[in-house]
């Protein structure tokens, strides 16, 4: 369905684009043998050619009147500049040395000191010769094209843009519902969340309740004391044993986004491990975005247990057909991660009332982003319309609203993967409660959806209830 719309796709979105993701993927390229080092260095030499192909694609988009908004181009140009300006402090230098050290310690004698020095020199040369020039090339190409875009608004302003958005949403979320049905589903959930929050806030006039009321407007960090990611992951892995199926023993490494790149990467992300080595896992934390301990706790649930890391490792332990590891079902993976994140509020040391307030509030905010995505790209909202919508819900900071608007323009349907995927899991759960009655348990439901693995929701429904 999406094939006629190839030029509507955008490989260079902020946060999720190739320019952001490639360096991280390169820095996580594992060295198991000497040949892996050679292959990695060869990959570096291909970067200019790869970026040239992206620029050719952007030129074709421009000629068809489909180039990105000028402010999106400006943001990507600035990101590329900052990346190049890191020079010798760029993490592609340090991560290479670390990976050589890991190989040398894992396989004694496989790498001599002389070889390590030679490979390090070669890597240093290649970064300067291939990586930085590729980014310079991107800066130059995007600067030339930046004002050639015909549309600074949503997809519906492009020819057949609404039809494309319908296909895109179906592809990104795995949901077969129409946009109107999705809007209705989101509005219903937001109303439910707000009603529950209101009930918690007004249901008890005791001192406990008044402290909740004051706490929700203060930094969330006052509520949780634990700030060590490894201890939090350990806590989370212990909390899921009752309601989630067991998973194999694994090793997880916590890494941190380089400070100078914090603005350009997500608050945290899980690196999907090699298909034949799921025991080694990496989670990146972006301290620039995670400013309090509750956010850290719920984010580590989203990236770790019982979300991305757990789901990947558990599914791999079932030995699925390898093709399943290549197929991309963002609605399932991000929906499951959001469902898990929402559940994690109740795994924390918060009181039940506090957990309910923060979880429902988080759900509402994500729901508003999802409605704004559909409003902007399907109903044609401009910035003023989006601002009016957010103002209705008490979000009045115009700079924040503009940032949200710009992100939604640059990456259509991205928020829907998370929120609609989450709502589809909630709908599946309601169906399971109705169909299984007294035989429903959290464990049975979780095992059923995890055993099916990433797929569209109509397929999951079919297999869970067959």
Describe each PLM feature range:
Residues 1-466:
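N-terminal maturation segment of proteins
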């Amino acid at each position: 369905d999406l094939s006629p719309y190839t030029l509507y796709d955008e490989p260079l979105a902020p946060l999720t684009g190739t320019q952001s993701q490639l360096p991280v993927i390169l820095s996580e390229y594992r060295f198991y043998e000497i040949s892996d080092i050679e292959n990695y260095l060869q990959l570096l030499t291909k970067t200019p050619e790869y970026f040239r192909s992206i620029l050719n694609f952007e030129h074709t988009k421009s000629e068809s009147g489909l180039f990105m908004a000028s402010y999106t181009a400006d943001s990507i140009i600035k990101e590329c500049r900052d990346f190049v300006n890191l020079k010798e402090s760029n993490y592609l230098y340090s991560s290479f040395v670390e990976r050589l050290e890991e190989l040398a310690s894992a396989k004694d004698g496989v790498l001599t000191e002389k070889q390590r020095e030679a490979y390090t020199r070669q890597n240093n040369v290649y970064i300067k010769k291939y990586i930085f020039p590729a980014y310079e090339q991107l800066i130059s190409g995007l600067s030339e094209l930046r004002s050639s875009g015909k549309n600074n608004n949503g997809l519906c302003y492009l020819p057949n843009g609404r039809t494309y958005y319908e296909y895109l949403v179906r592809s990104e979320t795995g949901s077969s519902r129409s946009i109107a049905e999705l809007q209705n589903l989101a509005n219903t959930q937001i109303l439910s969340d707000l009603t529950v929050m209101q009930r918690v806030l007004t249901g008890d006039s005791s001192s406990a309740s008044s402290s909740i009321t004051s706490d929700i407007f203060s930094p969330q960090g006052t509520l949780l004391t634990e700030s060590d990611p490894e201890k939090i992951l350990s806590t989370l892995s212990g909390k899921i044993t009752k309601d989630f199926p067991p998973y194999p023993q694994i090793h997880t490494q916590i890494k941190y986004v380089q400070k100078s790149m914090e603005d350009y990467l997500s608050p945290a992300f899980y690196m999907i491990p090699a298909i034949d080595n799921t025991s080694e896992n990496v989670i990146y934390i972006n301290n620039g975005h995670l400013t309090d301990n509750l956010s850290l706790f719920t984010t580590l649930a989203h990236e770790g247990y019982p979300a991305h890391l757990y789901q990947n490792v558990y599914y791999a332990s079932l030995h699925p057909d390898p093709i399943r590891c290549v197929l991309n079902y963002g609605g399932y993976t991000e929906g499951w991660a959001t469902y898990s994140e929402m559940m994690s509020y109740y795994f924390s040391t918060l009181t039940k009332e506090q957990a309910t307030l923060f979880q429902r509030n988080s759900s509402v905010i994500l729901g508003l982003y999802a409605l704004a995505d559909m409003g902007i790209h399907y109903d044609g909202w401009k910035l003023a319309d989006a601002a009016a919508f957010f103002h209705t819900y008490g979000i009045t900071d115009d700079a924040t609203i503009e940032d949200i608007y710009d992100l939604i323009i640059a990456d259509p349907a991205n928020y829907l993967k998370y929120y609609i995927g989450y709502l589809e899991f909630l709908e599946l759960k309601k169906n399971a409660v109705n169909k299984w009655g007294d035989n429903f348990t959290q464990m049975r439901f979780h095992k059923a959806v995890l055993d099916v693995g990433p797929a569209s929701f109509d397929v999951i429904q079919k297999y869970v209830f067959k």
